[in-house]
Amino acid sequence: MLAANDYRGGLGVSLFRRCSIGILLLTCLVTGPAYAELMTLKKRQQLDLSQYSVTNPEASYFDVATRKALLASTDNSLLLQSIDNLSGGMSCRQLLEIPPITNRLRIPGFYPDPQAWRQASQPLFQFEDSVSNLAGAFVATDDDYYAQCLGRFLDQWASQDALVHFHYSPSDRQAWYATESMIFAAAMAYSIVRPELEDQPEQRERIEDWFSRLAYRHAYVPNQTKESCCNNHFYRRALYATMIGVLTEDNELFRYGVGAVYSALNEMTQQGGLPRELARGRRAVHYQNYALMYLVTNMQIISRQGYDIFHLKVDGHTIKDAVDFLLDAIEDASILGENIPREQYHGFLRDNQYSSWMEIYQQHFSDPRIAEFLITQRPIYNRSAGGYVTLFFMDPTVQKYRRPKTEDEEKQQLSVYGKESSPL
């Protein structure tokens, strides 16, 4: 069995060294007015995050007890529908029959062959849905059965060292990418039920040791490419690092997650763009949103440890600048600059899992454009980055009923956002 310390040696410095490779190349790809300089190795190494430490290992990414109490007395039809859907019952015995992934995982790339990618990814999606559904059912019903089942399910995977082995090379990274979301899906779901497993100390120890080994094993992959080391995949790794750091009271992991927020704010353009995401051409807006999905969710975990991270200002920038830039760019792609195509891919706006972060964001800021957009998106579920976010976060007073888009709204969205495109 691999020990967590096997992957700790020089974690921060080694990862930041890889992140520095290719900075000049990327800067050339994304040029134009008001673009920030990408964070250098030296600057990353100089980040002092010693003021950040885990203060409450029992804190999930939302106040579970308070939310369960609210749901128990709500008359909100939208929330009641979600509660009813999750109360149908899941068989723990059937879930425990799902075989843990213990082989050296290998997944084909999405863009070369989407069909092969989807087929190979089904067991991974099944895992993410399983942990998120159990956590959601526990919150919806307050039935300890689901918490205990999630503990047994994760313990089974932990006991067999699942997900530790995966194929990776600089030219074949998909298995590494895929396990990112499996790790944070499991850690976030577990954080919801962890207090219910207090009478299972050995089980908790096995699960948390497994999480720690996965985090260090995964984050310390050698020969990371210039694209993967520091862009949205860095933010995805930061998400599980922060959550597992909390669960295991590991300040090194926790600060790794915090460091991703500092990195994003530091690199932000004057207008609020994330240069590494804007380098994606026709998918620049999509990847700005994609990055925010993990940054905002990560920030929510950090905020639950008592830090006002949503108002953190680095070089004059806050996360609100990135959100405002996204919303502006959706409406008018010309703000992206001369070197980025105005014909932007907007298919993500029709898939509500990509708006999961907005439900969290609205708890900290009340953005009218987001509020209007969410009305036709709810209820929102993201199988890995937050689960049933509408059930967990929505203020019951803002929307009482599910409201699909009208025909006129569909036409208006198409006129503003453009026709949905297939992934390039």
Predicted features, each with a name:
Residues 5-23:
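Bacterial N-terminal signal peptides that target proteins for export
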Residues 22-30:
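Bacterial N-terminal signal peptides
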Residues 36-224, 303, 311-424:
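Extracellular glycan-targeting catalytic surfaces
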Residues 164, 251, 267-271, 309, ...:
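Alpha-solenoid repeat scaffolds
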Residues 176-289:
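Active-site cradle of extracellular carbohydrate-active enzymes
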Residues 269-285, 301-319:
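A beta-strand-loop signature enriched in Asp, Gly, Thr, and Trp
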